[in-house]
Amino acid sequence: MKDILKLFKKNKKVEEFDSIKISLASPEVIRSWSFGEVKKPETINYRTLNPERDGLFCARIFGPIKDYECLCGKYKRLKHRGVICEKCGVEVTQSKVRRDRMGHIELAAPIAHIWFLKSLPSRIGLLLDMPLRDIERVLYFESYVITDPGITNLEKYQVLSEDQYIQALEENEDEFEAKMGAEAIQNLLKNMDLKKTCKILKKEVLKVNSETKRKKVTKRIKLIESLLTSKNKPEWMILTVLPILPPDLRPLVPLDGGRFATSDLNDLYRRVINRNNRLKRLLELFAPEIIVRNEKRMLQEAIDALLDNGRRGRSITGSNKRPLKSLADMIKGKQGRFRQNLLGKRVDYSGRSVITVGPYLHLNQCGIPKKMALELFKPFIYGKLEQRNLATTIKSAKKMVEKEEPIVWDILDEVIHKHPILLNRAPTLHRLGIQAFEPILIEGKAIQLHPLVCAAYNADFDGDQMAIHIPLTKTAQKEACSLMMSTKNILSPANGEPIIVPSQDVVLGIYYMTRKKINGKGENMLLSSPKEAEYMYSLGAVDLHSIVKIRILEYKKDEKKNLTEKKKIIKTTIGRAILWIHVPMGLPFKIFNKTLRKSHISEILNTCYRLLGLKKTVRLADQMMYIGFSYAAKSGVSVGINDIIIPKEKEKIIFQAEKEVLEIDKQFQTGLVTSSERYNKVIDIWAIANENIADAMMKNLSYEIIFQKNKKKITQKSFNNIFIMADSGARGSAAQIRQLAGMRGLMAKPDGSIIETPITANFREGLNVLQYFISTHGARKGLADTALKTANSGYLTRRLVDVAQDLVITQTNCKTKKGILMNSLIEGGDIKETLKERVLGRITVENIYHLNSKNIIIPKNTLLNEKWCNILEKNFIDSIIVRSVVHCETSFGVCAYCYGRDLARGKIVKKGEAVGVIAAQSIGEPGTQLTMRTFHIGGAASKVASESSIQIRKNGIIHLNQAKSVINSNGKIVIISRNVELKMLDKTGKTQESYKIPYGSILTKGEGQKVKAGEIIAKWDPHTIPVITEVNGYIKFIDMVDGKSITKQNDELTGLSSIVVLDISERNILGKDLKPALKIIGKNEEDIFIPGTDMPAQYFLPGKSIILLEDGMKISSGDILARVPQESVGTKDITGGLPRVADLFEARKPKELAILAEINGIVSFGKETKGKRRLILTPIDGNNIYEEMIPKWRQLNVFEGERVEKGDIISDGPESPHDILRLRGVQAVTNYIVNEVQEVYRLQGVKINDKHIEVIIRQMLRKATIINPGDSNFLQGEQIEYSKITSENKKLKKNKKETATFSRDLLGITKASLATESFISAASFQETTRVLTEAAVAGKKDKLRGLKENVIVGRLIPAGTGYKYHKKRLKNRIKNSVNKKNNMSSISVEEAAANLSELLNSTENINNRI
């Protein structure tokens, strides 16, 4: 009978599944998994090594130990398969069933599952609305809980201690029911009417006022609703049957010497079985209650330890004092099931070896040692040998290979021809860390690597190792060739610039050959072609650097891509002409006719790629490498001690600095400067001295004086070896040369503070003992930092990948009308990034018109390539709106138009591209280059902080943004609004410079006026904030009582008197309620109103204000009424580098953050409390007023009566991204995070495209909180996917119902990863227990849409080449479901098998009973 079933089963295919559901298992389900009950704690017999019957390894329950053989040996071999032995009860089948057959234990008492009890928030506690502490006391038999209060005055869910219970019994006898232990909790859960409770709670949530209570009730509603929808019963959180893992997943292995190695789970299971059996016996014997209770508690503890050891109480330890590894520990953490086995698998067919340089290789080749290739390509060689009939069997082929017969090498040559291999270098930080090459067989044992791919791998040849992987199938080879080949990856996915850029000796060689030299041999010759130049050079008739005139043939591509030639006679050098020979047609000569540094070579490759395409660029890169190596060798550059030239001025500069330091020490001793001022000044002096020495040294090194033929003295760039290396970008920098030939300068202590005695010596002179000791500080800190940095950077990358892993391009155009405004980044007089650089590769949202006419220059939905960007620049366009992933309206994934250009390919991105992972890698990969430093601003940096004027760099026209101003009595303009931006525009109206101007600045020129370069146009006092009047009139003092609210001071030196307002803390009781103010009144004491409002001109003065006017004085608008001193801030810490990036992506609130105005309105101050000020904002339209308490030590930027806009800064400080989102919207928070992250990377000279950061921001913004649910099913205060809300609102709008209102949330990347829809992805990231608990209770379904989930279930990922596969599967599934509906009448093989198996099971059950 079973054989027939097997026959049916052979035809049965694995059922296609498209989602995985997780839910609570009921006792019935657990029993249905089981193949029998385990009754004994025994494992195996120590003599026979056979499993004990009914024990943890029982063969009757779990299956035979040997294939097709029962335990007693009665039935052996395949012919008896399916038979159950009468003697030992073992089914004759394969032994691998021991990997998937489960058993179970019938528990003598119900036990609470620790995950649902202790994993916060406790599910059982939330459901019963009882504190966790009380539930634990009930479960561990310390207290009773009322399960049925009857007609007594006790309440259900009330917890009673032993004494209270006895007292209640005396009072009420048996009118009520109270229990303890898990049965009590099970009873409560069973008797819960979920639907009724849910209805009551939904009514209650509307009445609740307190925010915390509302949150709690909402949580309960969500939990109850999820239980109802998932059909999970709450009592299933209490176990009555415990499943047992299949024995082969918790093996017991005999070691030599009669000992056993076992999985910890066996110990834990034995403990449970022992205690369970003991409890059964005690219950049968009707043992005293106290003993039974103790046994039940011990059983509860044993099961807790099995499920999650250490979650409650002390961990159970094994014989070696090590905590036992429970089921929960098996799946969580780096060594857990998810990260160790499902996401990180080992790869077969791989080898690894040291790498060495292969300067003669082509870009698509790598050298593989013959021995290695022979081993790796074995299967292919065997196949070929058999195919050619050179070997009859695999065995003989194996022998031939082992003997290394000559024919084998020929076959190997054939096999590896056009068979790509993958080379990988750990750590693989971005996708270019693994690339494909064509193998070339070489002698030796090291892999040879092409020098140009080193940058992508971050490899060098100081002992680095690389791994080789062989793609086996035809499709894998095809994929490696078309996508992963090194020649296909010449642009970096992070910024779209070439990553195949020559470095070091190649750069040196090319720089050397393109340098020019005056008085060279054969100068001013006329040559007919570059070929002739090369010939003359080889004859020795001319020098490589001689300036000559040569006829150059240039080819230019026209619109139809045809080449047209052009002849020119050009003044150039011999070296440049020789280089031109190897350049492909179609490039202009002007980009080669200069001294080529590293950046120029990168530009050349970029231009070549855009103009001539991939193949020619690869060829050019290779040619440049060969030439570079050749001429680097010919140049004979090497470093000699005499190349390090110490400037003569050094001694003088150091002497001067020491003199100044002594002067400051004197001032300190006489008390003129404070200790911190002295320290800052000393450090400043040395920093400036160091700069001066460096300048003198570089001047000295970089130029040499030579005589022309006419005896005229001229300077030319020097050929000093060290200078050549630094100038070309091959090795070293000005900062390093400074240490060799200048002075080492200031050193930092490990805590980041600067040691004030600098090292005045350099390495050429040598350091003395003290100097050497000081410099070890920095060196050690550097090493320690590097180790920390690597770990931190890796963790950041992991979090980024996790949050963005499911973002894939799923659609071409989402047709959104939204976009982000892009303009040039200008800080002061410097352009940080031009508009062209920022919008390259983006898509326009709307038509772009000519500035003066209505002609469309660029139509909407255009991909801005280099050509369009040049048009933008020509037409002087300052800012445009482009599409961005932040605003993409695709519900799952992103659309190609919102993403724009695929940076690594230079074309619009294709469907299926995993843009999320690329973004995460691009941001994470340079992480190791960032610093871990926290900068202390002091000394040199603090000078910048106190600027007091603005000097213009270029001629232009002034433009003021959002500025309110008045004219003062001297006719100057005074700014009376905050956050004013002053821009300098050129003739075309394009911004050239941009400055921030504080309140109270005095401008010499006004809006629209012309200014000349070098003019100072704004001045202000950096140490005080002025209070400025907007009207003319007379002063009237209000609430200014000497000794109570103010005090008068006389300055002895100047003889001037001033009035100082006392701070509230300094006033006596009588002065506390006084509000000192200056009111401006007319001649007849009438009120004067502030222009544009109906508010009288009255200026309240904050504490410590200094007033230099007298009561009744006449004043005019723009005059300063009072000054508020700004407290001088000490050294500030600025978080920089990697920690700053992590803070931004985690959306952490900064300490002492800026306080922003929550609404538009007028500022006033209410009654103060101890240590806090009450700020009141009164809206102009008469809506509700807004109040906020602000600590008194915070310096406020606003005065009473001032009008502020929503989002304006009230108190300075770092802004919180959450506030920016709430008050200024998505666009503002995107700009803020992008600019702040870019700031950190820009400092290190790392280029990352904005769109990568935007991709991460999109993921951080994917949740929103419901404010008013309207007619939707959402709950108030619930956090839901933004895309879900928008689609729901569309439906509601269609049906003319009330839509839900919501506010966008900004989640940190860790939170966003855990809040993803997919529980598999979240569980494999962090907090596995919590995620799985939550998912199980809610009966969550994972639709397997992201990349991680598909890797875990072992499928191709739905991105890249797997994207088509998933689309195809979807089509087939829809097709099959249609076919199934049509063929419902005819019975399928599967159904027949199912019916038969049901029949068999019933007979099998009868046999078991007998």
Swiss-Prot record:
It holds the Pfam family RNA_pol_Rpb1_4. Signal peptide: none annotated. One of its GO terms (cellular component) is DNA-directed RNA polymerase complex. Its EC number is 2.7.7.6. Binds 1 Mg(2+) ion per subunit. The RNAP catalytic core consists of 2 alpha, 1 beta, 1 beta' and 1 omega subunit. When a sigma factor is associated with the core the holoenzyme is formed, which can initiate transcription. Belongs to the RNA polymerase beta' chain family. This is DNA-directed RNA polymerase subunit beta'. It comes from Buchnera aphidicola subsp. Cinara cedri (strain Cc).
